[in-house]
Design a protein with these regions (language model features):
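Active-site-adjacent segment of SDR/Rossmann-fold oxidoreductases
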Residues: 6-7, 28-40
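Active-site loop-to-helix junction immediately N-terminal to the catalytic Tyr of the SDR YXXXK motif
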Residues: 7-14
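Residue(s) in the substrate-gating loop at a strand-loop-helix junction
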Residues: 1
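Short linear elements at protein peripheries
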Residues: 112-122
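Active-site helix of classical SDR
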Residues: 18
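Short, flexible catalytic-loop segment of classical short-chain dehydrogenase/reductase
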Residues: 47-57, 61-62
Length: 122
């Protein structure tokens, strides 16, 4: 999940923390495999919103426009074939992740808090 690339997630702290763990673990394992000279690869897919039936069933609403499952898988395979470790297939999500690195943490956390709280209040 793209949550693993963000500084935290008010109102969803456990979710964001576990996703950050997965990203950290993936980076560590990739480096270990590289140093061992292994041909095995490890990747973390951090897609952001993906348009699936689950969203309708769970009544999930996203702040950013989602991508199709087919687009997500296609991008993931292409990036994995290139040796990319952390894969973010949605360009809008990728832009948000990059922006979050340059914006003060308090502002990013405030934006995430408002977004998550609005979902809780629906």
């Amino acid at each position: 999940s793209v949550a693993g690339l963000m500084p935290g997630g008010p109102y969803m702290a456990t979710y964001y923390a576990t996703k950050s763990y997965v990203v950290s673990l993936t980076n560590a394992l990739a480096e270990e495999l590289k140093r061992l000279g292994s041909h095995a690869q490890v990747h973390a897919l951090c897609p952001g919103p993906v348009n699936t039936e689950f969203n309708d069933v769970a009544n999930v609403k996203f702040s950013l426009k989602g991508i199709s499952a087919r687009e997500c898988v296609s991008h993931c395979i292409d990036e994995a074939d290139k040796g990319k470790i952390i894969i973010v297939p949605n360009m809008m999500v990728k832009a948000a992740v990059i922006a979050s690195k340059f914006v003060p943490r308090e502002i990013v956390l405030g934006i995430l808090a408002r977004s998550q709280k609005s979902k809780i209040e629906r």
